[in-house]
Design a protein with these regions (language model features):
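Hydrophobic core of transmembrane alpha-helices in multi-pass small-molecule transporters
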Residues: 27, 95, 108-126, 234, ...
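Helix-loop junctions on the cytosolic side of multi-pass membrane transporters
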Residues: 105-106, 133, 137, 179, ...
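C-terminal transmembrane bundle of multi-pass solute transporters/carriers
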Residues: 57, 66-71, 78, 82-88, ...
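Juxtamembrane intracellular "pre-TM" segments in multi-pass secondary transporters
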Residues: 1-19, 198-231, 414-428
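A single, central transmembrane helix in multi-pass transporters
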Residues: 23, 27, 31, 35-39, ...
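Hydrophobic alpha-helical transmembrane segments
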Residues: 110-121, 125, 146-199, 264-266, ...
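Small-residue hotspots at the loop-to-helix junctions and early N-terminal turns
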Residues: 36-39, 43, 48-58, 149, ...
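Transmembrane alpha-helical cores of Major Facilitator Superfamily
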Residues: 27, 59, 63, 90, ...
């Protein structure tokens, strides 16, 4: 059967049993996190009636995630990545079951919710970093685009469906069942993940953790391709913060309310899902760097145009296109970062790359929120998009190595082939 030049290539699931195991675990994990992400803020609000305390829990999750990324990156380049993945997933699952136990008692502890938010953020990020570092050796660098698209498709589907399912569970059975199901599903991911082979990092050199992390940062600065990709990715992360002004855009631009805001929030992931599903052509690009930077520049122009659009349908179409381009840019970032980073640095580079995405989104939200306080929301959106467009053009011109990168160079092997050794375990 010939591969479609348009749609994502599913053959990796058929022929690579290790990636198939990861895909199954990822689907279960996305579902678990989707129903959990609804439960925590709902329960805290029920217990305290305070949006501030809900925000504190979300902030603690973010802090845990950032620290987990930093620690996980160093650990993933030092220890067996399979062990780290299983350990992190198992501890996350136990944390969710602890939340279920806390919710079943007569007076649930808000402090326990705070602690578990930190716990989940830390171990979730640690496991994610180890898993991303293992992907190139499992699928081969030539299959990174397909692996990234399939993973992205899973996340997009989960982001749309799982929170809705979580809300239904809360309404029909109570928040305790969200935690219980999330814990069971997360521990259930250990079944497919236990099938993974031993995933020892290559060429490990003992070093102090801070020095090891610094080495990863130095690689980002010195490598013209990976450093440029991360810089462009930061700009894209800033653009994602436009959602902060969706309520103001709906009111001032479209004379709408909550219904219109909901449509706007749905348009972006819908476009992203279409982008992931129709990304079969990405792996064969002759100039992947140019397409990536071009996608971000056009995305910036779309954000600027939102400050000028006065029709809801046109605005929703623009947001869907924004999601589509963001999906393509993210997939190319994944492929280029994974494809140009040596195995011995994959943990640390992935941790720093994901951290900049988290920080970039937060800074973008803060910046556009502050801009909207001193100007009209529509003007703030236009100014934000125009500034991002200028920055994107400067990057496109300035990052010569990225612009001239060919598809053949993007798939160039950096390490010796990795021999995947079956893990002898009587379990599962």
């Amino acid at each position: 059967m010939r591969k479609s030049p348009l749609f994502v290539d599913f053959s990796l699931l058929k022929f690579n049993r290790y990636f198939r195991a990861i895909f199954m675990a990822r689907m279960m994990s996305v579902f678990a996190l989707g129903i959990l992400i609804v439960a925590v803020p709902v329960q805290i609000h029920q217990l305290t009636g305070s949006t501030l305390q809900v925000g504190m829990a979300m902030a603690l999750d973010g802090v845990g995630m950032f620290v987990g990324l930093m620690c996980g990156g160093v650990l993933a380049d030092r220890y067996n990545r399979r062990t780290l993945i299983l350990l992190a997933r198992g501890l996350c699952g136990l944390g969710f079951l602890a939340l279920a136990l806390n919710s079943f008692i007569a007076e649930p502890s808000v402090l326990a919710l705070y602690i578990m938010s930190l716990w989940d953020g830390f171990f979730g990020a640690m496991g994610m970093t180890a898993l991303m570092a293992a992907i190139p050796s499992i699928v081969g660098r030539e299959n990174l685009a397909a692996a990234g698209a399939l993973s992205m498709l899973t996340v997009r589907f989960g982001a749309v469906l799982a929170p809705a399912v979580g809300g239904i569970i809360i309404a029909s059975a109570g928040v305790s069942w969200n935690y219980l199901l999330a814990g069971i599903a997360t521990l259930g991911t250990l079944i497919p993940l236990a099938r993974l082979p031993s995933l020892e990092p290559q060429d490990y050199e003992p070093a102090h953790p801070l020095r090891a992390l610094l080495e990863g940062f130095q690689f980002l600065v010195q490598n013209k391709i990976v450093g440029a990709v991360v810089a462009v990715g930061t700009l894209q992360a800033l653009l994602s913060a436009i959602r902060v002004l969706f309520p103001a855009l709906a009111e001032d631009g479209y004379n709408g309310g909550a219904f219109e805001v909901g449509l706007m929030f749905s348009a972006v992931p819908l476009g992203a899902m279409i982008g992931a599903f129709t990304s079969g052509w990405v792996g064969g690009l002759r100039r992947p760097g140019t397409v990536m930077t071009g996608s971000v520049v056009v995305s910036s122009l779309i954000v600027a145009s939102l400050g000028l659009i006065s029709h809801l349908v046109v605005g929703l179409a623009a947001l869907a296109l924004l999601g589509y381009l963001g999906s393509i840019a993210s997939l190319l970032q994944f492929t280029l970062v994974q494809g140009h980073t040596p195995d011995r640095l994959l943990g640390r580079v992935n941790s720093l790359w994901n951290a900049q995405d988290v920080v970039g989104d937060a800074l973008g939200a803060l910046g556009i929120g502050a801009l909207a306080r001193v100007t009209a929301p529509l003007l703030a959106v236009f100014s934000f998009g125009a500034s991002a467009t200028l920055a994107g053009i400067i990057m496109s011109v300035g990052f010569v190595s990225l612009r001239q990168l060919s598809g053949v160079d993007a798939l160039a092997p950096l390490d010796a082939p990795v021999e995947l050794v079956e893990h002898e375990s009587p379990g599962f």
